[in-house]
Amino acid sequence: MKTWKDVIGNEKTQPYFQHILAQVHQARASGKVVYPPQADIFNAFKLTEFDQVKVVLLGQDPYHGPNQAHGLAFSVKPPVAPPPSLMNMYKELSNEYPDFHMPNHGSLEQWAQQGVLLLNTVLTVERGQAHSHADFGWETFTDHVIHALNEQREHLVFLLWGSHAQKKGQFIDRSKHCVLTAPHPSPLSAHRGFFGCGHFTQTNDYLRRHHISEINWQLDNI
């Protein structure tokens, strides 16, 4: 059984990674508010072990409002209301699954526990400043994560929504993985083809064809 520690454990000893952590520490030390909290930065890896990954859902950088980001792409901790992009994901789920019920929260931990790696490509952000840590070096780290999944696993579903995610995933081997692309679920672009993309059902169709247990997208109310 391969773990994240086996696959990317040596990243943490690399100078570029030490530099990322130093920049995050420096930002916090200077009084800036950085999201998510330090203990939550690597939550995606804690909740979805390397050999348990079935689906990779790429986000961009964490939510930059108070109490939103907790280390899982698109997800927010209760009682924070689901942001617009996540609401649009729920709407698409309702379109694909008529019996899907809108959850009363925005936590996607149940997806993560089933094998959906909710990976932002940049893992920290300054409060109120979208993309403020985009040049810290996180992209190098998450490129290595995606590369490891691409090389060492097979029959994964990669959900690439929006041009940033699609560019990030352009090297994925489509002969051994399923790559699904659509516009981002943001209100700015959801109507250009995210709605009606069918990705949630297509994901489960692919998993089923390869004898992999499907994702139950329905989230329990809390």
Curated annotation (Swiss-Prot):
It comes from the Bacteria. It is found in: Cytoplasm. Gene3D superfamilies: Uracil-DNA glycosylase-like domain. One of its GO terms (cellular component) is cytoplasm. Its EC number is 3.2.2.27. Belongs to the uracil-DNA glycosylase (UDG) superfamily. UNG family. PANTHER family: URACIL-DNA GLYCOSYLASE (PTHR11264:SF0). This is Uracil-DNA glycosylase. The gene is ung.
